[in-house]
């Protein structure tokens, strides 16, 4: 544990680095100790120590910028009015050649303190896979309510992607354990919802609730497609999650379609 009253010059660089490695920028900031650490490092004029100080300052700046970005997303949701419960809903899987379309609805506590913001939420496609996995669990743990809905490839073929998209939006919202006063949907108004609904273009980059829904839906569907990859190994589902990559199309042409392919999406390929 670093003692800020200790003479830093009595420590080797390796000792300093080891101690700092144990620290969290987030905890330092929340405990108001980041300034103490930077001032302590500044007392040492060794170049490697000063470089370490600069790195910590950059990490702190990145963290504060992220807090600011996510605060703006929470404020965006609150800007619609004094609704008690706001749900964000998003889908994943409109475009793939195989597998279902999945939607998730999420109600967040939009009045949390800064320390309880869910940082790094964004359009799920902009978040790296390992981070999405981590965030999905955090969102499910912290959400006041969330619900996932699925429409199969067969239903997509029978009734069309627009019907399936609306169905999963509607089902995920109507199945929430808390009835929302407002639903923010990504890109589309939801037909027959019976709850006040506003669509937000590129909502997963603007709205905290929609971004959270985007991540949970993406992680759920990706896991599902990776399970399907074990049953249908010829299409590279573990990597393309059903989208029409060259390997996927190559598999289709060589082995034909599987039970989870969308026939209506394959008319120009087979």
Curated annotation (Swiss-Prot):
Gene Ontology cellular component terms for the protein in this record: cytoplasm; ribonuclease H2 complex
Swiss-Prot/TrEMBL cofactor(s): Mn(2+); Mg(2+)
Record carries keyword Zinc-finger: no
EC top class, as a word: hydrolase
BP terms from Gene Ontology: DNA replication, removal of RNA primer; mismatch repair
Pfam families in the record: RNase_HII (PF01351)
Keywords, sorted A to Z: Cytoplasm, Endonuclease, Hydrolase, Manganese, Metal-binding, Nuclease
Subcellular localization(s) per the UniProt record: Cytoplasm
Record text on cofactor binding: Manganese or magnesium. Binds 1 divalent metal ion per monomer in the absence of substrate. May bind a second metal ion after substrate binding.
Main location: cytoplasm
Binding site for a divalent metal cation: 90-91, 186
Gene3D superfamilies noted in UniProt: Ribonuclease H-like superfamily/Ribonuclease H
Disulfide bonds, paired cysteine numbers: none
Gene Ontology MF term list: manganese ion binding; RNA binding; RNA-DNA hybrid ribonuclease activity
Sequence ranges assigned to domain RNase H type-2 in this UniProt record: 84-270
Reaction(s) the record says it catalyses: Endonucleolytic cleavage to 5'-phosphomonoester
Family, per entry: Belongs to the RNase HII family.
Role according to the record: Endonuclease that specifically degrades the RNA of RNA-DNA hybrids.
Cross-referenced PANTHER family: RIBONUCLEASE H2 SUBUNIT A (PTHR10954), RIBONUCLEASE HII (PTHR10954:SF18)
Name the record gives this protein: Ribonuclease HII
Gene behind this protein: rnhB
């Amino acid at each position: 544990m670093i003692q800020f009253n200790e003479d830093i010059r009595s420590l080797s660089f390796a000792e300093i680095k080891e101690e700092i490695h144990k620290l969290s920028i987030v905890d330092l900031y929340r405990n108001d100790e980041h300034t103490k650490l930077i001032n302590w490092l500044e007392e040492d004029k060794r170049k490697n120590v000063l470089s370490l100080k600069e790195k910590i300052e950059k990490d702190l700046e990145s963290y504060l910028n992220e807090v600011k970005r996510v605060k703006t997303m929470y404020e965006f949701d609150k800007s619609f009015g004094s609704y008690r419960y706001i749900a964000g809903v998003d889908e994943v899987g409109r475009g793939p050649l195989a597998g279902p379309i999945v939607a998730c609805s999420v109600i967040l506590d939009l009045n949390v303190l800064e320390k309880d913001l869910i940082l790094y939420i964004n359009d799920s496609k902009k978040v790296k896979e390992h981070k999405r996995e981590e965030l999905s669990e955090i969102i499910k743990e912290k959400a006041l309510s969330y619900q996932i809905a699925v429409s199969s490839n067969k239903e997509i073929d029978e009734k069309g992607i627009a019907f399936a998209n609306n169905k999963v939006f509607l089902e995920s919202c109507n199945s929430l354990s808390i009835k929302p006063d407002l639903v923010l949907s990504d890109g589309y108004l939801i037909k027959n919802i019976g709850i006040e609904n506003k669509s937000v273009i590129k909502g997963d980059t603007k709205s905290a609730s929609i971004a959270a829904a985007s991540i949970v839906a993406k992680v759920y569907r990706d896991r599902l497609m990776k399970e399907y990859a074990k049953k249908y190994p010829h299409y590279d589902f573990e990597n393309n999650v059903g989208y029409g990559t060259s390997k996927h199309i190559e598999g289709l042409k060589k082995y034909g379609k599987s039970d989870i392919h969308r026939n209506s999406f394959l008319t120009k390929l087979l």
